[in-house]
């Protein structure tokens, strides 16, 4: 029970006792303690102060059914009572204790009560159960702070339990834990393999204020089971165990030393390897990316074994009756590790003539020896003459047979200027009659009527092959004296020499390229020994061509895809049937992952596994807008298992990068040492990259019903993508209404919106229920759907309506757009717009030998000889690469045997359409190579 008031008699008695006690204090003490409350006029009459709490009741928690005790102390205090939830506690429930303070002499009163679980549970309302002390003295009352009494508990389930994870070595790991609800709030500690984590001892661990565990830098020793433990005065709870695995990604060891050249003589390969052991993958870490070995072309000087010269004449007979003869080991001298001559350097034998004084023979014996020696000499001389005559006869017979066999195939061209300039042009032309014979004048025009001198096969100089063009300061195109070029003609060559369609090369002999059937037989024999993939035969998405050491170009018409095989890329004497194939995306695992987008067709060039002596150049179109620097561009290749692997990230090349990419505005030229399947992908740094698209509208060629469909295709801005849509619509009976329009599509997560407007409602109506259609952003950006389109279905009220005018608007939400103003006829004789009509003449797929290149071989050779050697002034191949804008990563060219040759090959690939040699001439002139200045011009139709 609680009391509502305090008895008056008890209060009066307490007041009198306090006054008597105060009168016993010394005046000095009383003055110090009560100077702030008594007036200055009564310093000798002290008064009792307000009660001061020495101990106030604390918050308490009831565990199970055990009551809690609340205690308070105060002085000076005549009475102390508890007040709980605004009501006085019954006097009988108080336990009071009194004592006198030894220092102050004041009475210290202590009061104690108990609060049970039942009292707390009987309280209704939102406020917790509370109690406070009220103390009295003669000066008045003082209240203590409130203490709250709550029933303690701890729920069983955690609000959030830690989850196991895998973390890379030395990376940060976060384990989250939200303990169960409880009163008082639970304290949290973490266990690692059942041992408490002390973050003060191991500073690699951090326990945050919200009870999360952070591993700052994961160590292998941190691989363990982690448990979050929550506890308070009631109970202790454990979370489920979270397993943390610290994994190690594999790292490459250092490269080994280059192995010796595998060929003791001539061209070969050097190899070096590395292992994925620095560190080795651990606990599920990834294997190393990149090549495990590298190859490097080498050229070892062939060893020359020594050979003896002829014996010298015998020396005069000495007094010891001995004469000598000698020989030298210099025919040839041993070089490059060749063997020394074996045998004797000096030879001696006994003699009896000369100064020899022993065993004099009679004159008759001497004469007989002389006659015998004379007979031997005559015999040997006769044999030598007979052998010489036989050799002459055999040579004469061989020459006669050779001339008879080659009478229909040989033509000698003695004009060196015509031979040289003929290398510049794929057809014959009339030479300019100017005095300066070492320049090619820009006024030279192709002679389309002349047939003499047209190149139809291999070109051979009849001079010694060892007579190479030296590095000189003389003009590059000096007249070549008495140069003869042997040209093999063939009666089966067509009107375009050196140019063949890919279908003619599948199993058929490439006429006009190889002079005899023996070479083709050799080619078939060589190819039969190669372990190559089967060539594709689907002419709709592949082209093929047969190439030898003279190289050539394989072009996929109307797709922007081509393969340039430089001269010397294929080993001498071998011929390969090579192919290009555009893979259908619906049948191929896509190379893009995450936020990456496909930027080019997926191209397979083969056969794979070819041993190439020089890099080939694969040209593929792309649809990235490279005017912005927000792209991360990658070239990927597909392994035999079908997985895509990164070959190179542009601008992150290293010496181990196996290829080089020359990026142009609409295409990429890739120098490859290995043939295979390749694709170009990209993603943006900050979601501002732009992808070029094409919008094409198709309508049915013939419409006999009231419904009329307009299809709006959204494809990548590459020729092959539009070509695929054109072929698809042709099979469906559709035609292209007007020229496709470009659209810049930004990586902004906004969809592509299409709408139709200005329909003549008196004749037509739209069956589209909404105001517009949308293509989701990811469908467009990913590039996975090649024939992405929307269809607008219109209905005419009568078959008499044969014309339709309307507008179609295509735009990216909050981005760019295009508007098509359409006017189409539904009559039968409609003409489809053909975007490739201007390129119809470029349907040639294969160019062989010199016809594939703009720079003649002799001029190319002289440029390489002049620029390959490093120059202290810097005007060597490095400056040429800079002038031609091919200097993004010069270390790639530096690893090649002829850096200039690779740069010129890349220039050929970049200028396959224009063939403007003036750019090369200007670059050489700016380099200060005045002796190489060329006046180059190409006239004629593209």
Curated annotation (Swiss-Prot):
Extracellular side: 31-380
Domain Ig-like, residue spans: 51-148
Bilayer topology: Single-pass type I membrane protein
Pfam families: Death, I-set, TSP_1, UPA, ZU5
Region (UPA domain): 687-835
Signal peptide: 1-30
GO molecular function term, any single one: netrin receptor activity
Sorted UniProt keywords: Cell membrane, Developmental protein, Disulfide bond, Glycoprotein, Immunoglobulin domain, Membrane, Receptor, Repeat, Signal, Transmembrane, Transmembrane helix
Places the protein is found: Cell membrane
Chief localisation class: membrane
Sequence ranges assigned to domain Ig-like C2-type in this UniProt record: 150-245
SMART domains associated with the record: DEATH (SM00005), IG (SM00409), IGc2 (SM00408), TSP1 (SM00209), ZU5 (SM00218)
Membrane-spanning intervals of the chain: 381-401
Annotated ranges, domain ZU5: 541-684
Residues of the Death domain: 863-940
Cysteine disulfide links: 72-133, 84-131, 177-228, 261-298, 265-302, 276-288, 317-351, 321-356, 329-341
Cellular component GO terms, alphabetical: plasma membrane
Cytoplasmic side: 402-942
GO biological process per UniProt: anterior/posterior axon guidance
Sites carrying sugar chains: 225, 350
Quaternary structure and interacting proteins, as annotated: Interacts (via extracellular domain) with flrt3 (via extracellular domain). Interacts with rnd1.
Role description: Plays a role in cell-cell adhesion during embryonic development. Receptor for netrin required for axon guidance. Mediates axon repulsion of neuronal growth cones in the developing nervous system upon ligand binding.
Family membership: Belongs to the unc-5 family.
Protein name: Netrin receptor UNC5B-b
């Amino acid at each position: 029970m609680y009391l509502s008031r305090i008895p008056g008699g008890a209060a009066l008695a307490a007041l009198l006792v306090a006054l008597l006690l105060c009168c016993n204090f010394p005046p000095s003490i009383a003055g110090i303690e009560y100077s702030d409350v008594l007036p200055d006029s009564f310093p000798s009459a002290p008064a009792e102060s307000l009660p001061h709490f020495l101990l106030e009741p604390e918050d308490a928690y009831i565990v199970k059914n055990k009551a809690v005790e609340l205690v308070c102390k105060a002085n000076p205090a005549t009475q102390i009572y508890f007040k709980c939830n605004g009501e006085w506690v019954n006097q009988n429930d108080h336990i009071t204790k009194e004592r006198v303070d030894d220092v102050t002499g004041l009475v210290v009163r202590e009061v104690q009560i108990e609060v049970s679980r039942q009292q707390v549970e009987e309280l209704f309302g939102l406020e917790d159960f509370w109690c406070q002390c009220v103390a009295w003295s003669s000066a008045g009352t003082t209240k203590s702070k409130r203490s709250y009494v709550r029933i303690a508990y701890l729920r069983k389930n955690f609000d959030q339990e830690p989850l196991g994870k895998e973390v890379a070595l030395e990376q940060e790991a976060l384990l989250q834990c939200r303990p169960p609800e409880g009163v008082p709030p639970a304290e949290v500690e973490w266990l690692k393999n059942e041992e408490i984590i002390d973050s003060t001892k191991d500073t690699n661990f951090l326990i945050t204020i919200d009870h999360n565990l952070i591993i700052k830098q994961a160590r292998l020793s941190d691989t363990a089971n982690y448990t979050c433990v929550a506890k308070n005065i009631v109970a202790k709870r454990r979370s489920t165990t979270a397993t943390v695995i610290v994994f190690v990604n594999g790292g490459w060891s250092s490269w080994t030393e280059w192995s010796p050249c595998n060929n003791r003589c001539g061209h070969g390969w050097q190899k070096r390897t590395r292992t994925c052991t620095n560190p080795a993958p651990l606990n599920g870490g990834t294997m190393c990316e990149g090549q495990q070995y590298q190859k490097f072309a080498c050229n070892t000087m062939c060893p020359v074994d020594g050979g003896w010269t002829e014996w010298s004449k015998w020396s005069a007979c000495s007094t010891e009756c001995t004469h000598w003869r000698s020989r030298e080991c210099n025919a040839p001298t041993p070089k490059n590790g060749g063997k020394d001559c074996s045998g004797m350097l000096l030879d001696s034998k006994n003699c009896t003539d000369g100064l020899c004084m022993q065993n004099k023979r009679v004159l008759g014996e001497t004469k007989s020896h002389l006659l015998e020696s004379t007979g031997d000499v005559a015999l040997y001389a006769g044999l030598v003459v007979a052998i010489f005559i036989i050799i002459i006869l055999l040579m004469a017979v061989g020459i006669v047979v050779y001339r008879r066999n080659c009478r229909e195939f040989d033509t000698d061209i003695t004009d060196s200027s015509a031979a040289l300039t003929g290398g510049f042009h794929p057809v014959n032309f009339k030479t300019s009659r100017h005095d300066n014979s070492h320049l090619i004048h820009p006024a030279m025009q192709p002679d389309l009527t002349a047939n003499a001198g047209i190149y139809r096969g291999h070109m051979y100089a009849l001079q010694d092959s060892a007579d190479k063009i030296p590095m000189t300061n003389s003009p590059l195109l000096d007249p070549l004296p008495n140069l003869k070029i042997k040209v093999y003609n063939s009666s089966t060559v067509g009107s375009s020499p050196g140019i063949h369609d890919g279908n003619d090369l599948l199993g058929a002999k490439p006429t006009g390229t190889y002079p005899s059937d023996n070479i083709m037989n050799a080619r078939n024999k060589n190819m039969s020994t190669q372990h190559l993939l089967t060539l594709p035969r689907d002419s709709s998405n592949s082209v093929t061509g047969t190439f030898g050491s003279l190289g050539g170009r394989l072009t996929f018409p109307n797709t922007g895809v081509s393969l340039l095989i430089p001269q010397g890329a294929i080993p001498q004497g071998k011929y390969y049937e090579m192919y290009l194939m555009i893979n259908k995306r619906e049948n191929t695992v896509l190379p893009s992952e995450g936020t990456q987008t496909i930027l080019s067709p997926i191209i397979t060039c083969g056969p794979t596994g070819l041993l190439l002596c020089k890099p080939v150049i694969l040209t593929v179109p792309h649809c990235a807008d490279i005017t912005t620097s927000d792209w991360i561009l990658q070239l990927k290749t597909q392994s035999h298992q079908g997985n895509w692997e990164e070959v190179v990230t542009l601008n992150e090349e290293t010496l181990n990068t196996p290829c080089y990419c020359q990026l142009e505005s609409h295409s990429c030229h890739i120098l490859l040492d290995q043939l295979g399947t390749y694709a170009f992908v990209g993603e943006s740094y900050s979601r501002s990259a732009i992808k070029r698209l094409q919008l094409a509208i198709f309508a049915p060629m013939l419409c006999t019903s009231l419904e009329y469909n307009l299809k709006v295709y959204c494809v990548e801005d590459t020729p092959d993508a539009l070509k695929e849509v054109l072929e698809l619509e042709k099979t469906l009976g559709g035609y292209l209404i007007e020229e496709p329009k470009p659209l810049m599509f930004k990586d902004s997560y906004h969809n592509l919106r299409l709408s139709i407007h200005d329909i003549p409602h008196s004749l037509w109506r739209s069956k589209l229920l909404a105001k517009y259609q949308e293509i989701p952003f990811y469908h467009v950006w990913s590039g996975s759907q090649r024939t992405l389109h929307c269809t607008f279905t219109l209905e005419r009220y009568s078959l008499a309506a044969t014309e339709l005018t309307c507008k179609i608007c295509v735009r990216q939400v909050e981005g760019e757009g295009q508007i098509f103003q359409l006017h189409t006829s539904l009559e039968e004789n409609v003409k489809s717009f053909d975007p490739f009509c201007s390129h119809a003449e470029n349907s040639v797929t294969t160019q062989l030998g010199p016809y594939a290149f703009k720079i003649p071989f002799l001029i190319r050779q002289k440029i390489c000889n002049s620029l390959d050697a490093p120059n202290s002034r810097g005007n060597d191949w490095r400056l040429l690469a800079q002038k031609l804008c091919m200097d993004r990563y010069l270390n790639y060219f530096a690893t090649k045997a002829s850096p200039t040759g690779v740069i010129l090959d890349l220039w050929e690939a970049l200028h396959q359409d224009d063939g403007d040699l003036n750019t090369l001439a200007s670059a050489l002139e700016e380099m200060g190579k005045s002796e190489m200045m060329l006046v180059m011009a190409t006239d004629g139709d593209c």
